[in-house]
């Protein structure tokens, strides 16, 4: 028994110095003397850094009366030419255009506190998805038909990738007045 205790203390004695060499000292800290301790005493605002005057052209989104929708909702209403460019982008990516409409353009909970089918996330589809559509004017014509049929409804265009089975883009094409 004594021989086994001697062997274990010898092993511990040898392991001690090896562990202290395993952790390197922490180098690279600078002395606090190198950092200034006081703030600049000059209160002249002309010496403050600026971003080149871009702040004057920024606007704050009004918190009431203008709700945000989906993609591109921060822009002014899209013209027919702008819609055509977005639909061309959608078609160039081989996405299937789909038109949907809804009376309420926002998510709302009316029937239950938890999310469900009737909480405004799902809109009514206008006709069928436009499989095989190659021209933006076809999609714009369908949007115009939907606007005439439901003038008090929101109309949106969705780009659906049928290979990945996902919705890739969605934006409001028409907002009722």
Swiss-Prot record:
Additional free-text comment from the UniProt record: This protein is coded by one member of a small multigene family. The basic functional RuBisCO is composed of a large chain homodimer in a 'head-to-tail' conformation. In form I RuBisCO this homodimer is arranged in a barrel-like tetramer with the small subunits forming a tetrameric 'cap' on each end of the 'barrel'.
- Give an example GO molecular function: ribulose-bisphosphate carboxylase activity
Q: Where in the cell is it found?
A: Plastid, Chloroplast
What turns on this gene?
Answer: Accumulates to low levels when grown under continuous white light.
Q: What is this protein called?
A: Ribulose bisphosphate carboxylase small subunit, chloroplastic 2
Query: Briefly, what is this protein's role?
Result: RuBisCO catalyzes two reactions: the carboxylation of D-ribulose 1,5-bisphosphate, the primary event in carbon dioxide fixation, as well as the oxidative fragmentation of the pentose substrate. Both reactions occur simultaneously and in competition at the same active site. Although the small subunit is not catalytic it is essential for maximal activity.
Q: Which family does it belong to?
A: Belongs to the RuBisCO small chain family.
Q: Which organism is it from?
A: Lemna gibba
